[in-house]
Amino acid sequence: MEVIHGRPYCCRELEGADILSNTFYSNGLHTPYETTIRPTASEDRYQELRQALPQCRLRWGADREYGGMLPVSLPEEHRPKCEPPRLMSKGHQHYGFGGEIWPKKLPIEQYYYLTQNKKSDLYGNDSLLPKPPNSTVGEICSSYPIEHPYHTHISRGAMFPAFTSPKDLYTGVKARTQQPFPPTLPTKTYDSTILKTRGNPYRYELLDLPTDSKKKALTWPGQSVYYDFPKCVEKNKPVFYPKPPKTFAPNSSVTPWDTMTSAKDANIQRNLERSHWLTSYTHDFTGLGPMSPLELDDYREKELAELTGQIGFDPQPQEKFHPSLKPPRPLDGRIARLIQNQRPLEATVQIPPSCPDCTPRVLCAFHTFIPSSAEMMAMNDHLLSGLTHKNQNIEDKIKEEQRLLSTYALPSSYESKDMGSLFDLHSLPKITDTKKSDDLYWRQLDVKPLPIARSKSNHYIDYEPHKSTYRDPYAMCLNPVRLSKSNILQNKTDMADLTFDNYLRKPEFLGTDIESSDETRPLLNWISRAGVPKHHTNFRDFKNSFSRSMAHKRLHNSIQEEQKDLRDKLQCGMRHQFYGHNSHYFYN
Protein backbone atom coordinates (compact mmCIF):
# COMPACT_ATOMS: atom_id res chain seq x y z
CA MET A 1 0.00 0.00 0.00
CA GLU A 2 1.38 3.35 -0.99
CA VAL A 3 1.98 5.94 1.63
CA ILE A 4 0.12 9.13 0.90
CA HIS A 5 1.99 12.23 1.96
CA GLY A 6 -0.71 14.47 3.20
CA ARG A 7 -2.25 15.86 6.30
CA PRO A 8 -5.79 14.85 7.16
CA TYR A 9 -6.69 18.36 8.29
CA CYS A 10 -10.23 18.06 6.90
CA CYS A 11 -11.19 15.44 9.46
CA ARG A 12 -12.81 16.91 12.54
CA GLU A 13 -11.41 14.28 14.90
CA LEU A 14 -8.13 14.94 16.61
CA GLU A 15 -5.14 13.30 15.04
CA GLY A 16 -3.54 12.46 18.34
CA ALA A 17 -0.08 13.65 17.45
CA ASP A 18 0.62 14.45 21.11
CA ILE A 19 0.48 10.84 22.25
CA LEU A 20 2.69 9.34 19.53
CA SER A 21 6.18 8.25 20.44
CA ASN A 22 9.28 10.16 19.48
CA THR A 23 10.06 7.64 16.78
CA PHE A 24 7.27 9.08 14.66
CA TYR A 25 9.01 12.47 14.57
CA SER A 26 12.63 11.36 14.43
CA ASN A 27 12.21 9.07 11.46
CA GLY A 28 12.72 11.37 8.51
CA LEU A 29 13.61 8.59 6.12
CA HIS A 30 10.19 7.01 5.84
CA THR A 31 7.81 9.86 6.59
CA PRO A 32 9.60 13.14 6.05
CA TYR A 33 6.41 15.17 5.69
CA GLU A 34 4.50 13.77 8.64
CA THR A 35 6.66 15.33 11.34
CA THR A 36 3.95 17.50 12.78
CA ILE A 37 4.70 20.31 15.15
CA ARG A 38 3.48 19.94 18.68
CA PRO A 39 1.15 22.73 19.87
CA THR A 40 2.87 25.24 22.10
CA ALA A 41 -0.29 27.14 23.10
CA SER A 42 -2.43 26.25 26.06
CA GLU A 43 -5.23 23.73 25.79
CA ASP A 44 -7.95 26.33 26.23
CA ARG A 45 -6.43 28.60 23.60
CA TYR A 46 -6.08 25.67 21.24
CA GLN A 47 -9.75 24.75 21.58
CA GLU A 48 -10.76 28.36 21.07
CA LEU A 49 -8.76 28.68 17.85
CA ARG A 50 -10.00 25.34 16.63
CA GLN A 51 -13.61 26.34 17.09
CA ALA A 52 -13.01 29.69 15.36
CA LEU A 53 -11.48 28.03 12.28
CA PRO A 54 -14.08 28.08 9.46
CA GLN A 55 -14.79 24.63 8.12
CA CYS A 56 -17.04 23.56 5.31
CA ARG A 57 -19.96 21.44 6.28
CA LEU A 58 -19.89 17.95 4.98
CA ARG A 59 -22.85 16.63 3.07
CA TRP A 60 -25.16 13.84 4.00
CA GLY A 61 -24.01 13.96 7.63
CA ALA A 62 -20.57 12.69 6.71
CA ASP A 63 -18.99 14.59 9.64
CA ARG A 64 -20.22 11.85 11.93
CA GLU A 65 -18.63 9.06 9.88
CA TYR A 66 -15.13 7.66 9.75
CA GLY A 67 -13.50 9.51 6.89
CA GLY A 68 -13.16 12.95 5.38
CA MET A 69 -12.42 15.02 2.28
CA LEU A 70 -9.11 13.69 0.98
CA PRO A 71 -7.22 14.04 -2.30
CA VAL A 72 -7.64 11.25 -4.82
CA SER A 73 -5.05 8.57 -4.37
CA LEU A 74 -3.85 7.38 -7.81
CA PRO A 75 -0.72 5.60 -8.98
CA GLU A 76 2.07 7.69 -10.41
CA GLU A 77 1.55 6.40 -13.95
CA HIS A 78 -2.13 7.32 -13.87
CA ARG A 79 -1.78 10.74 -12.35
CA PRO A 80 -3.54 13.47 -14.41
CA LYS A 81 -1.83 16.64 -15.47
CA CYS A 82 -3.83 18.73 -13.08
CA GLU A 83 -4.61 17.71 -9.54
CA PRO A 84 -8.19 16.43 -9.25
CA PRO A 85 -10.42 17.92 -6.60
CA ARG A 86 -10.74 16.32 -3.20
CA LEU A 87 -13.32 13.65 -2.83
CA MET A 88 -15.11 12.01 0.04
CA SER A 89 -13.02 9.12 1.33
CA LYS A 90 -13.98 6.53 3.88
CA GLY A 91 -11.71 5.35 6.63
CA HIS A 92 -11.27 1.91 8.13
CA GLN A 93 -14.60 0.14 8.49
CA HIS A 94 -14.42 -0.68 12.19
CA TYR A 95 -18.19 -0.71 12.25
CA GLY A 96 -20.36 -1.30 9.18
CA PHE A 97 -22.54 1.59 8.21
CA GLY A 98 -24.87 -0.25 5.78
CA GLY A 99 -24.10 1.90 2.75
CA GLU A 100 -22.14 1.51 -0.41
CA ILE A 101 -18.44 2.07 -0.27
CA TRP A 102 -17.58 5.16 -2.28
CA PRO A 103 -15.39 5.79 -4.23
CA LYS A 104 -14.68 2.35 -5.62
CA LYS A 105 -11.43 0.73 -6.73
CA LEU A 106 -9.32 3.26 -4.87
CA PRO A 107 -6.82 2.67 -2.11
CA ILE A 108 -8.20 3.61 1.28
CA GLU A 109 -6.09 5.34 3.89
CA GLN A 110 -6.20 3.62 7.27
CA TYR A 111 -6.79 6.01 10.15
CA TYR A 112 -5.51 4.13 13.22
CA TYR A 113 -5.34 7.23 15.36
CA LEU A 114 -9.14 7.50 15.42
CA THR A 115 -9.44 4.45 17.67
CA GLN A 116 -7.53 3.02 20.63
CA ASN A 117 -5.34 0.95 18.35
CA LYS A 118 -1.77 2.14 18.10
CA LYS A 119 -0.44 3.15 14.72
CA SER A 120 2.93 1.90 13.65
CA ASP A 121 5.63 4.38 14.47
CA LEU A 122 7.66 3.61 11.35
CA TYR A 123 5.37 2.56 8.57
CA GLY A 124 2.04 3.63 7.17
CA ASN A 125 0.86 0.05 6.65
CA ASP A 126 0.36 -2.80 9.11
CA SER A 127 3.83 -4.27 8.83
CA LEU A 128 5.47 -4.34 12.25
CA LEU A 129 8.89 -5.70 11.34
CA PRO A 130 11.11 -4.35 8.58
CA LYS A 131 12.07 -6.50 5.69
CA PRO A 132 15.32 -8.48 6.01
CA PRO A 133 17.17 -6.52 3.33
CA ASN A 134 16.51 -3.29 5.19
CA SER A 135 17.62 -4.39 8.69
CA THR A 136 19.86 -6.87 10.43
CA VAL A 137 18.45 -9.10 13.11
CA GLY A 138 20.85 -10.01 15.95
CA GLU A 139 20.44 -12.24 19.02
CA ILE A 140 20.44 -10.41 22.31
CA CYS A 141 21.53 -12.25 25.45
CA SER A 142 20.30 -10.38 28.51
CA SER A 143 18.84 -11.51 31.76
CA TYR A 144 15.16 -11.15 32.32
CA PRO A 145 13.03 -11.82 35.40
CA ILE A 146 11.41 -15.19 35.52
CA GLU A 147 9.06 -16.78 37.97
CA HIS A 148 7.50 -20.11 38.58
CA PRO A 149 4.48 -20.86 36.37
CA TYR A 150 2.48 -21.55 39.50
CA HIS A 151 3.73 -18.45 41.24
CA THR A 152 0.26 -16.93 41.39
CA HIS A 153 -0.78 -19.77 43.70
CA ILE A 154 2.34 -19.66 45.86
CA SER A 155 2.66 -17.11 48.65
CA ARG A 156 5.58 -14.80 48.07
CA GLY A 157 6.25 -14.03 51.73
CA ALA A 158 6.71 -16.42 54.60
CA MET A 159 4.04 -17.04 57.18
CA PHE A 160 6.17 -15.53 59.94
CA PRO A 161 7.72 -12.25 58.79
CA ALA A 162 11.37 -11.53 59.36
CA PHE A 163 12.77 -8.16 60.42
CA THR A 164 16.29 -8.94 59.31
CA SER A 165 17.97 -5.79 58.11
CA PRO A 166 21.29 -5.50 56.27
CA LYS A 167 22.20 -2.80 58.81
CA ASP A 168 21.86 -5.13 61.77
CA LEU A 169 24.91 -5.31 64.01
CA TYR A 170 24.55 -9.04 64.60
CA THR A 171 23.13 -10.44 61.35
CA GLY A 172 23.80 -7.68 58.81
CA VAL A 173 26.63 -6.72 56.52
CA LYS A 174 28.88 -5.57 59.36
CA ALA A 175 28.59 -8.92 61.12
CA ARG A 176 29.62 -10.75 57.93
CA THR A 177 32.90 -8.86 57.76
CA GLN A 178 33.92 -9.95 61.26
CA GLN A 179 35.50 -13.34 61.76
CA PRO A 180 34.84 -15.43 63.68
CA PHE A 181 31.18 -14.81 63.10
CA PRO A 182 28.93 -14.05 66.06
CA PRO A 183 26.53 -16.79 67.17
CA THR A 184 23.61 -14.81 65.74
CA LEU A 185 24.90 -15.00 62.15
CA PRO A 186 24.18 -18.21 60.20
CA THR A 187 26.92 -19.72 58.07
CA LYS A 188 26.93 -21.94 55.01
CA THR A 189 26.99 -25.68 55.24
CA TYR A 190 30.16 -27.63 54.71
CA ASP A 191 31.07 -28.85 51.23
CA SER A 192 30.66 -32.53 50.51
CA THR A 193 32.40 -34.36 47.67
CA ILE A 194 31.03 -37.71 46.57
CA LEU A 195 33.50 -40.05 44.90
CA LYS A 196 31.78 -43.05 43.33
CA THR A 197 32.61 -45.04 40.27
CA ARG A 198 29.73 -46.09 38.09
CA GLY A 199 28.81 -49.63 38.90
CA ASN A 200 30.89 -49.70 42.05
CA PRO A 201 28.86 -50.60 45.14
CA TYR A 202 31.19 -48.71 47.41
CA ARG A 203 30.36 -45.05 47.99
CA TYR A 204 33.01 -42.63 49.14
CA GLU A 205 32.15 -39.13 50.43
CA LEU A 206 34.63 -36.45 51.31
CA LEU A 207 33.38 -33.87 53.81
CA ASP A 208 35.18 -30.59 54.26
CA LEU A 209 34.66 -29.11 57.74
CA PRO A 210 36.26 -25.67 57.71
CA THR A 211 37.36 -23.85 60.84
CA ASP A 212 35.51 -20.87 62.22
CA SER A 213 37.90 -18.45 60.57
CA LYS A 214 37.27 -19.99 57.13
CA LYS A 215 33.50 -20.28 57.27
CA LYS A 216 31.37 -18.21 54.95
CA ALA A 217 28.20 -16.38 55.82
CA LEU A 218 24.91 -17.73 54.62
CA THR A 219 23.19 -15.73 51.88
CA TRP A 220 19.65 -16.06 50.66
CA PRO A 221 19.38 -15.98 46.86
CA GLY A 222 16.56 -14.23 45.15
CA GLN A 223 15.73 -11.62 47.76
CA SER A 224 14.09 -9.33 45.21
CA VAL A 225 13.49 -11.38 42.04
CA TYR A 226 15.04 -14.24 40.08
CA TYR A 227 16.71 -13.58 36.74
CA ASP A 228 17.07 -16.12 34.03
CA PHE A 229 19.16 -16.11 30.84
CA PRO A 230 17.72 -16.99 27.44
CA LYS A 231 19.06 -19.75 25.30
CA CYS A 232 22.02 -18.32 23.44
CA VAL A 233 24.91 -19.66 21.51
CA GLU A 234 27.42 -19.08 24.28
CA LYS A 235 25.07 -19.79 27.16
CA ASN A 236 23.73 -22.96 28.59
CA LYS A 237 20.13 -23.92 28.48
CA PRO A 238 18.28 -22.13 31.30
CA VAL A 239 16.07 -23.79 33.84
CA PHE A 240 12.53 -23.51 32.62
CA TYR A 241 10.88 -24.07 35.97
CA PRO A 242 12.81 -22.13 38.62
CA LYS A 243 12.18 -22.65 42.29
CA PRO A 244 9.85 -20.16 43.95
CA PRO A 245 11.46 -17.52 46.19
CA LYS A 246 9.79 -18.81 49.33
CA THR A 247 11.72 -22.07 49.26
CA PHE A 248 14.99 -20.16 49.42
CA ALA A 249 14.43 -16.97 51.38
CA PRO A 250 12.16 -16.66 54.43
CA ASN A 251 10.91 -13.34 53.20
CA SER A 252 11.86 -10.70 50.71
CA SER A 253 13.93 -7.87 52.10
CA VAL A 254 12.55 -4.39 51.85
CA THR A 255 15.95 -2.71 51.75
CA PRO A 256 18.83 -3.81 49.52
CA TRP A 257 21.76 -5.67 51.01
CA ASP A 258 24.24 -2.88 50.55
CA THR A 259 26.75 -1.28 52.86
CA MET A 260 25.49 -0.31 56.28
CA THR A 261 24.88 3.43 56.64
CA SER A 262 23.53 3.82 60.17
CA ALA A 263 24.15 1.35 62.99
CA LYS A 264 21.71 3.20 65.21
CA ASP A 265 18.83 2.53 62.82
CA ALA A 266 19.77 -1.13 62.64
CA ASN A 267 19.76 -1.37 66.43
CA ILE A 268 16.29 0.18 66.58
CA GLN A 269 15.03 -2.26 63.95
CA ARG A 270 16.44 -5.21 65.89
CA ASN A 271 14.80 -4.02 69.11
CA LEU A 272 11.56 -3.60 67.19
CA GLU A 273 11.82 -7.22 66.09
CA ARG A 274 12.46 -8.39 69.64
CA SER A 275 9.53 -6.35 70.92
CA HIS A 276 7.24 -8.50 68.77
CA TRP A 277 8.43 -11.58 70.60
CA LEU A 278 6.64 -10.50 73.76
CA THR A 279 3.39 -12.29 74.38
CA SER A 280 0.15 -10.48 74.99
CA TYR A 281 0.06 -11.80 78.55
CA THR A 282 3.48 -10.33 79.31
CA HIS A 283 2.45 -7.06 77.71
CA ASP A 284 -0.89 -6.67 79.48
CA PHE A 285 -0.22 -8.18 82.92
CA THR A 286 2.88 -6.73 84.53
CA GLY A 287 1.55 -6.35 88.06
CA LEU A 288 1.18 -2.59 87.60
CA GLY A 289 -1.14 -2.54 84.62
CA PRO A 290 -0.28 -2.71 80.91
CA MET A 291 3.33 -2.39 79.85
CA SER A 292 4.60 1.06 78.96
CA PRO A 293 6.16 1.77 75.53
CA LEU A 294 9.55 0.14 75.13
CA GLU A 295 12.79 2.05 74.75
CA LEU A 296 14.00 0.93 71.33
CA ASP A 297 17.01 3.23 71.11
CA ASP A 298 19.69 1.77 73.43
CA TYR A 299 22.60 2.16 71.03
CA ARG A 300 24.52 4.39 73.45
CA GLU A 301 24.42 1.79 76.23
CA LYS A 302 25.66 -0.91 73.86
CA GLU A 303 28.53 1.31 72.72
CA LEU A 304 29.56 1.89 76.32
CA ALA A 305 29.42 -1.85 76.97
CA GLU A 306 31.64 -2.48 73.95
CA LEU A 307 34.17 0.12 75.08
CA THR A 308 34.29 -1.28 78.61
CA GLY A 309 34.84 -4.82 77.34
CA GLN A 310 31.53 -6.42 78.18
CA ILE A 311 30.90 -9.48 76.03
CA GLY A 312 27.42 -10.49 74.97
CA PHE A 313 25.73 -7.30 76.13
CA ASP A 314 22.37 -7.53 74.38
CA PRO A 315 19.64 -6.80 76.93
CA GLN A 316 15.96 -7.02 76.25
CA PRO A 317 14.17 -3.75 75.39
CA GLN A 318 13.21 -2.03 78.61
CA GLU A 319 10.23 0.16 79.36
CA LYS A 320 10.61 3.91 79.05
CA PHE A 321 8.97 4.46 82.42
CA HIS A 322 7.47 2.16 85.00
CA PRO A 323 3.86 2.84 85.93
CA SER A 324 3.24 3.54 89.59
CA LEU A 325 -0.01 3.41 91.46
CA LYS A 326 -1.17 6.89 92.20
CA PRO A 327 -2.33 7.20 95.80
CA PRO A 328 -5.95 8.17 96.20
CA ARG A 329 -6.85 11.63 97.25
CA PRO A 330 -6.42 11.89 101.03
CA LEU A 331 -9.30 12.71 103.28
CA ASP A 332 -9.90 16.29 104.24
CA GLY A 333 -9.32 17.58 107.71
CA ARG A 334 -7.66 16.10 110.73
CA ILE A 335 -7.38 12.49 109.44
CA ALA A 336 -5.63 13.58 106.24
CA ARG A 337 -2.97 15.48 108.15
CA LEU A 338 -2.38 12.52 110.44
CA ILE A 339 -1.94 10.17 107.45
CA GLN A 340 0.51 12.57 105.82
CA ASN A 341 2.46 13.00 109.09
CA GLN A 342 1.69 16.70 109.21
CA ARG A 343 1.07 18.91 112.19
CA PRO A 344 -2.65 19.15 112.99
CA LEU A 345 -4.19 22.51 112.37
CA GLU A 346 -4.67 24.57 115.50
CA ALA A 347 -6.02 28.03 116.02
CA THR A 348 -3.19 30.45 116.71
CA VAL A 349 -4.92 32.44 119.41
CA GLN A 350 -2.68 34.20 121.87
CA ILE A 351 -4.03 33.61 125.34
CA PRO A 352 -3.44 36.60 127.58
CA PRO A 353 -1.24 35.86 130.60
CA SER A 354 -2.96 35.04 133.86
CA CYS A 355 -0.87 37.62 135.66
CA PRO A 356 -1.52 41.25 134.71
CA ASP A 357 2.13 42.09 135.24
CA CYS A 358 3.33 39.45 132.78
CA THR A 359 3.61 39.95 129.05
CA PRO A 360 3.89 37.23 126.36
CA ARG A 361 7.65 37.82 126.12
CA VAL A 362 8.66 39.21 129.55
CA LEU A 363 7.45 37.71 132.82
CA CYS A 364 7.10 39.54 136.07
CA ALA A 365 9.56 39.16 138.94
CA PHE A 366 7.28 36.71 140.74
CA HIS A 367 6.69 34.26 137.85
CA THR A 368 10.27 34.46 136.68
CA PHE A 369 11.35 32.14 139.49
CA ILE A 370 8.06 30.45 140.43
CA PRO A 371 6.23 28.35 137.79
CA SER A 372 2.73 29.31 136.83
CA SER A 373 -0.37 27.19 137.29
CA ALA A 374 -0.30 26.10 133.63
CA GLU A 375 3.17 24.65 134.07
CA MET A 376 2.06 22.91 137.25
CA MET A 377 -0.89 21.39 135.40
CA ALA A 378 1.36 20.19 132.57
CA MET A 379 3.73 18.50 134.99
CA ASN A 380 0.90 16.66 136.76
CA ASP A 381 -0.66 15.57 133.47
CA HIS A 382 2.59 14.03 132.33
CA LEU A 383 3.02 12.27 135.63
CA LEU A 384 -0.46 10.77 135.55
CA SER A 385 -0.02 9.45 132.01
CA GLY A 386 3.11 7.54 132.96
CA LEU A 387 5.46 9.59 130.84
CA THR A 388 7.67 11.10 133.52
CA HIS A 389 10.74 9.58 131.90
CA LYS A 390 10.20 11.82 128.85
CA ASN A 391 9.95 15.08 130.83
CA GLN A 392 13.58 15.60 131.68
CA ASN A 393 13.43 19.16 130.38
CA ILE A 394 10.68 20.08 132.84
CA GLU A 395 12.62 18.58 135.74
CA ASP A 396 15.76 20.45 134.77
CA LYS A 397 13.79 23.68 134.57
CA ILE A 398 12.29 23.20 138.05
CA LYS A 399 15.67 22.35 139.55
CA GLU A 400 17.12 25.46 137.96
CA GLU A 401 14.30 27.54 139.46
CA GLN A 402 14.95 26.04 142.91
CA ARG A 403 18.60 26.95 142.61
CA LEU A 404 17.70 30.52 141.67
CA LEU A 405 15.23 30.79 144.56
CA SER A 406 17.88 29.77 147.03
CA THR A 407 20.29 32.48 145.85
CA TYR A 408 17.71 35.20 145.13
CA ALA A 409 17.85 38.26 147.39
CA LEU A 410 14.43 39.64 148.26
CA PRO A 411 13.78 43.42 148.28
CA SER A 412 14.13 45.50 151.47
CA SER A 413 10.39 45.45 152.14
CA TYR A 414 10.40 41.63 152.19
CA GLU A 415 13.64 40.92 154.04
CA SER A 416 12.16 40.07 157.45
CA LYS A 417 8.96 38.45 156.21
CA ASP A 418 8.18 34.99 155.02
CA MET A 419 5.52 33.87 152.56
CA GLY A 420 2.81 33.80 155.21
CA SER A 421 3.45 37.32 156.44
CA LEU A 422 3.75 38.50 152.86
CA PHE A 423 0.31 37.13 152.15
CA ASP A 424 -1.12 38.75 155.32
CA LEU A 425 0.19 42.24 154.67
CA HIS A 426 -0.03 42.53 150.97
CA SER A 427 -3.20 40.62 150.16
CA LEU A 428 -5.07 43.71 149.10
CA PRO A 429 -5.77 44.24 145.37
CA LYS A 430 -3.66 46.79 143.58
CA ILE A 431 -4.33 49.04 140.63
CA THR A 432 -3.24 47.03 137.61
CA ASP A 433 -2.73 49.94 135.27
CA THR A 434 1.04 49.78 134.89
CA LYS A 435 1.13 52.92 132.75
CA LYS A 436 0.60 55.01 135.89
CA SER A 437 3.36 56.05 138.18
CA ASP A 438 4.84 53.68 140.74
CA ASP A 439 3.30 55.60 143.67
CA LEU A 440 -0.15 55.15 142.25
CA TYR A 441 0.54 51.48 141.57
CA TRP A 442 1.66 50.66 145.13
CA ARG A 443 -1.18 52.63 146.78
CA GLN A 444 -3.59 50.40 148.63
CA LEU A 445 -7.34 50.64 148.24
CA ASP A 446 -9.68 51.26 151.16
CA VAL A 447 -11.42 47.91 151.01
CA LYS A 448 -11.82 45.16 153.49
CA PRO A 449 -8.99 42.66 153.21
CA LEU A 450 -9.80 39.13 152.11
CA PRO A 451 -9.79 36.39 154.74
CA ILE A 452 -6.61 34.40 155.00
CA ALA A 453 -6.73 30.86 153.72
CA ARG A 454 -5.41 28.43 156.33
CA SER A 455 -4.28 24.90 155.77
CA LYS A 456 -6.66 22.39 157.34
CA SER A 457 -5.98 18.71 156.99
CA ASN A 458 -9.44 17.58 157.95
CA HIS A 459 -11.04 19.14 154.84
CA TYR A 460 -11.70 16.77 151.92
CA ILE A 461 -12.57 17.70 148.35
CA ASP A 462 -14.92 15.33 146.57
CA TYR A 463 -13.71 14.24 143.11
CA GLU A 464 -16.79 12.31 142.09
CA PRO A 465 -18.40 15.02 139.89
CA HIS A 466 -15.29 15.06 137.69
CA LYS A 467 -14.03 12.36 135.35
CA SER A 468 -10.66 10.79 135.72
CA THR A 469 -7.97 11.88 133.33
CA TYR A 470 -6.91 8.33 132.68
CA ARG A 471 -10.18 7.54 130.92
CA ASP A 472 -10.88 10.90 129.28
CA PRO A 473 -7.96 12.27 127.24
CA TYR A 474 -9.98 15.38 126.29
CA ALA A 475 -10.11 16.80 129.83
CA MET A 476 -8.38 20.11 130.26
CA CYS A 477 -7.48 19.78 133.91
CA LEU A 478 -7.73 17.27 136.73
CA ASN A 479 -9.47 19.43 139.26
CA PRO A 480 -10.99 22.85 138.62
CA VAL A 481 -10.19 23.86 142.18
CA ARG A 482 -6.53 23.10 141.67
CA LEU A 483 -6.28 25.79 139.00
CA SER A 484 -7.65 28.46 141.31
CA LYS A 485 -5.85 27.39 144.49
CA SER A 486 -2.14 26.87 144.17
CA ASN A 487 -0.16 25.10 146.86
CA ILE A 488 2.65 27.60 146.66
CA LEU A 489 0.44 30.24 148.33
CA GLN A 490 -0.67 28.10 151.23
CA ASN A 491 -0.47 29.69 154.62
CA LYS A 492 2.30 28.73 157.00
CA THR A 493 4.43 27.30 154.23
CA ASP A 494 8.14 27.79 154.32
CA MET A 495 10.28 28.43 151.24
CA ALA A 496 12.43 25.48 152.10
CA ASP A 497 9.45 23.15 151.67
CA LEU A 498 9.06 24.27 148.04
CA THR A 499 10.66 21.16 146.59
CA PHE A 500 10.11 19.02 143.53
CA ASP A 501 7.99 16.55 145.47
CA ASN A 502 5.51 19.30 146.34
CA TYR A 503 5.04 20.11 142.69
CA LEU A 504 4.64 16.57 141.42
CA ARG A 505 2.33 15.06 143.97
CA LYS A 506 -0.59 12.80 143.17
CA PRO A 507 -3.90 14.50 142.44
CA GLU A 508 -5.67 13.07 145.42
CA PHE A 509 -3.15 14.73 147.76
CA LEU A 510 -2.66 17.91 145.76
CA GLY A 511 -5.80 19.82 146.82
CA THR A 512 -6.59 18.32 150.25
CA ASP A 513 -5.19 21.34 152.10
CA ILE A 514 -7.27 23.86 150.18
CA GLU A 515 -10.76 24.95 151.13
CA SER A 516 -13.44 25.07 148.44
CA SER A 517 -15.74 27.66 150.01
CA ASP A 518 -16.60 30.95 148.32
CA GLU A 519 -15.19 32.93 151.24
CA THR A 520 -11.72 31.49 150.83
CA ARG A 521 -11.05 32.28 147.14
CA PRO A 522 -7.35 32.85 146.50
CA LEU A 523 -5.65 35.87 145.12
CA LEU A 524 -5.13 34.28 141.66
CA ASN A 525 -8.79 34.35 140.76
CA TRP A 526 -8.32 36.15 137.45
CA ILE A 527 -7.62 32.90 135.54
CA SER A 528 -10.29 32.61 132.88
CA ARG A 529 -12.63 29.61 133.16
CA ALA A 530 -10.70 28.27 136.10
CA GLY A 531 -13.58 26.54 137.83
CA VAL A 532 -15.56 25.60 134.74
CA PRO A 533 -14.91 22.05 133.49
CA LYS A 534 -14.40 21.65 129.76
CA HIS A 535 -17.20 20.12 127.72
CA HIS A 536 -16.36 16.51 126.93
CA THR A 537 -16.84 15.55 123.27
CA ASN A 538 -17.35 12.05 122.03
CA PHE A 539 -16.78 11.56 118.30
CA ARG A 540 -17.95 7.98 118.41
CA ASP A 541 -21.35 8.94 119.81
CA PHE A 542 -21.66 11.62 117.14
CA LYS A 543 -20.79 9.10 114.43
CA ASN A 544 -23.25 6.51 115.74
CA SER A 545 -26.00 9.09 115.97
CA PHE A 546 -26.10 9.49 112.16
CA SER A 547 -28.55 7.30 110.26
CA ARG A 548 -28.73 7.30 106.50
CA SER A 549 -32.32 6.11 106.38
CA MET A 550 -33.39 8.80 108.84
CA ALA A 551 -31.58 11.42 106.78
CA HIS A 552 -33.45 10.29 103.65
CA LYS A 553 -36.70 10.31 105.57
CA ARG A 554 -36.15 13.85 106.84
CA LEU A 555 -35.21 14.94 103.31
CA HIS A 556 -38.39 13.53 101.79
CA ASN A 557 -40.50 14.95 104.60
CA SER A 558 -39.01 18.39 104.04
CA ILE A 559 -40.35 18.38 100.47
CA GLN A 560 -43.97 19.38 100.85
CA GLU A 561 -44.84 19.82 97.20
CA GLU A 562 -46.35 17.04 95.16
CA GLN A 563 -43.85 14.77 93.44
CA LYS A 564 -43.91 14.87 89.67
CA ASP A 565 -44.33 11.75 87.62
CA LEU A 566 -41.32 11.53 85.37
CA ARG A 567 -43.19 9.29 82.96
CA ASP A 568 -45.33 12.22 81.84
CA LYS A 569 -44.21 13.50 78.48
CA LEU A 570 -44.30 17.24 78.92
CA GLN A 571 -43.40 19.68 76.20
CA CYS A 572 -42.08 22.33 78.57
CA GLY A 573 -39.50 22.21 81.30
CA MET A 574 -36.49 19.96 81.47
CA ARG A 575 -36.07 17.03 79.13
CA HIS A 576 -37.14 13.53 80.12
CA GLN A 577 -35.28 11.54 77.48
CA PHE A 578 -31.68 10.55 78.18
CA TYR A 579 -29.70 8.43 75.70
CA GLY A 580 -32.93 7.40 74.00
CA HIS A 581 -34.65 6.19 77.20
CA ASN A 582 -37.19 7.86 79.44
CA SER A 583 -35.92 9.11 82.76
CA HIS A 584 -38.40 6.82 84.51
CA TYR A 585 -35.94 3.96 84.08
CA PHE A 586 -33.22 5.98 85.82
CA TYR A 587 -35.39 7.04 88.76
CA ASN A 588 -34.05 5.56 92.01
Swiss-Prot record:
Subcellular localization: Cytoplasm, Cytoskeleton, Microtubule organizing center, Centrosome; Cytoplasm, Cytoskeleton, Flagellum axoneme
Residues in cross-link Glycyl lysine isopeptide (Lys-Gly) (interchain with G-Cter in SUMO2): K543
A cellular component annotation (GO) from this entry: centrosome
Modified residues (Phosphotyrosine): Y441
Modified-residue entries (Phosphoserine), positions: S224, S406, S421, S427, S437, S457, S484, S516, S545
Chief location: cytoplasm
Positions of disulphide bridges: none
One Pfam family matching this protein: SPMIP4-like
List of residues that carry Phosphothreonine: T219, T512
Keyword annotations from UniProtKB, A to Z: Cell projection, Cilium, Cytoplasm, Cytoskeleton, Flagellum, Isopeptide bond, Phosphoprotein, Ubl conjugation
Biological function: Microtubule inner protein (MIP) part of the dynein-decorated doublet microtubules (DMTs) in flagellum axoneme. May serve to reinforce and thus stabilize the microtubule structure in the sperm flagella.
Protein name: Sperm-associated microtubule inner protein 4
Organism the protein comes from: Rattus norvegicus (Rat)
